[in-house]
Amino acid sequence: MTGAHFKYDESRDTLYITFVPGKKATGIALNDQLLLRVDKATRQAVGITIFDYSYLAQPTAIGVRSLPLTGLTELSTELHELALEILQKPPVNAILLLSAYSPSVTETIPITLLQTEMLVTA
């Protein structure tokens, strides 16, 4: 992935991904492990912080690990829509694949999975 800067802090098991170095950003907690950093004025991703990275990057016995985006429910409508917009376009969608879990016909929960193959080649 061109243009992205990766920094792994082994002692904290945290991966920092920066798309626009030095740019001030608003942090949006997608859940306890994922922090999306955005420029609200330009509606662009500035970076992603992935906590517990080594755990999240490991597949389970039945496949890749999906994470509910529980933090979206706590956002204002404006930030919720901005986060979903940014998650669905480059460069973020090359790292986090957005999907939906539907436990019933009336409920949809946004989830994501970490596309580790993109990080290995970066």
Where are these regions (language model features)?
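Active-site and channel-lining beta-strand-loop segments
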Residues: 8, 32-53
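Intrinsically disordered terminal and processing segments
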Residues: 1-33, 55-62, 66-122
